[in-house]
UniProtKB/Swiss-Prot annotation:
Its main location: cytoplasm. HAMAP family: OTCase (MF_01109). The keyword Transport does not apply. InterPro entries: Asp/Orn_carbamoyltranf_P-bd, Asp/Orn_carbamoylTrfase, Asp/Orn_carbamoylTrfase_sf, Asp_carbamoyltransf_Asp/Orn-bd, Orn/put_carbamltrans, OTCase_ArgI. Keywords: Arginine metabolism, Cytoplasm, Transferase. Reversibly catalyzes the transfer of the carbamoyl group from carbamoyl phosphate (CP) to the N(epsilon) atom of ornithine (ORN) to produce L-citrulline. This is Ornithine carbamoyltransferase. GO terms for molecular function: amino acid binding; ornithine carbamoyltransferase activity. Its EC number is 2.1.3.3. GO terms for cellular component: cytoplasm.
Length: 308
């Protein structure tokens, strides 16, 4: 073990270097193998993970809670509706208190500025479980799933069909760091915000008006719900706007013959993806969902213990 010399947070995908991701992806495979072989591994014995949820989730809570347990620690669930965070306690104060009683903190919230402010006042590592702007743990799991199924992602093409949401912006950061092409297609009014795309990422990002063309030659086609949490009032308008951006078998046929399909779930069959695609032979959504568990274990282990 080579413990970290200072506190490190994971708030955006760009917070880690290529070399760190190479380590984390390798480590994820090792920890997954331990899990499959029923091998006990408790590097986080008696460590406590605080899980703060302002946005509800099934996969995020289950994967983090099971993950810290499998590493020998335990989790404390904090819902903002049931804590002082939901009664107006300043974020800075909450960070000071919670980080004095726990070893690592995961937050799933709305604005990115909330988690940035929290981390700035935390004495322990903070992990972004999801914000409106970024979802780094999910994209890390997706990349691990791709590598597991198809090998290195460098030089490959990842196509995003759908809203410019937290997943899309995280894929933009990942493309620059890991060196793959990112094809993006969404209807007008739902495009990538130039202010959210670094100039250094532009050579890796290619925007298409036609979603079929965006899928040409893709090694991975991925999407998400048309209406993210917090945007429910726009649901009907989004359904009308995104009608041509459902991932279909025709789109998958434009991709590479061995292309994969991913969706971070939950999915709405018949909206953002055809049932024949998500339930078809190219879909790896269940492996993708499971791999949240393994990459997050590698992440927590790295943030608290450094490298093995």
């Amino acid at each position: 073990m080579n413990p970290p010399s200072s506190i490190k947070h994971y708030l955006q995908f760009k917070d880690f270097s290529l070399e760190e991701y190479e380590y984390l992806l390798d480590r994820s495979a090792i920890l997954k193998a331990k899990f499959k072989n029923y091998e006990t591994w408790h590097p986080l014995h008696d460590r406590t993970l605080a899980m703060i949820f302002e946005k509800n989730s099934t996969r995020t809570r289950l994967s983090f809670e099971a993950g810290i347990h499998q590493l020998g620690g335990h989790a404390v669930f904090l819902n903002t509706r049931d804590s002082q965070l939901g009664r107006g306690e300043p974020i800075e104060d909450a960070a000071q208190v919670i980080s004095r009683m726990t070893d690592i903190i995961m937050i799933r919230t709305f604005g990115q500025e909330i988690i940035e402010r929290f981390a700035a006042h935390s004495r322990v590592p903070v992990i972004n479980g999801l914000t409106n702007e970024y979802h780094p743990c999910q994209v890390l799991a997706d990349i691990f799933t791709f590598i597991e199924q198809r090998g290195p992602i460098k030089g490959k093409t990842v196509t995003w069909v759908g809203d410019a949401n937290n997943m899309a912006y995280t894929w933009v950061q990942a493309a620059e760091i890991l060196g793959f092409r990112f094809h993006f297609s969404a209807p007008k009014g739902y495009q990538l915000d130039p202010a959210m795309v670094a100039d250094s990422a532009l050579p890796f990002v290619h925007v298409f008006e036609n979603p079929l063309e965006a899928c040409d030659g893709a090694h991975l086609v991925t999407t998400d719900v048309w209406t993210s949490m917090g945007y429910e009032a726009e649901n009907e308008a989004r359904k009308k706007a995104f009608g041509d951006w459902m991932v279909t078998e025709a789109m998958m046929q434009r991709a590479q013959p061995d292309a994969l399909f991913m969706h971070c779930l939950p999915a709405h069959r018949g909206e953002e993806v055809e049932a024949a695609v998500i339930d078809g032979k190219q879909s790896v959504v269940w492996d993708e969902a499971e791999n949240r568990l393994h990459v997050q274990k590698a992440l927590m282990e790295y943030l608290l213990c450094g490298r093995y």
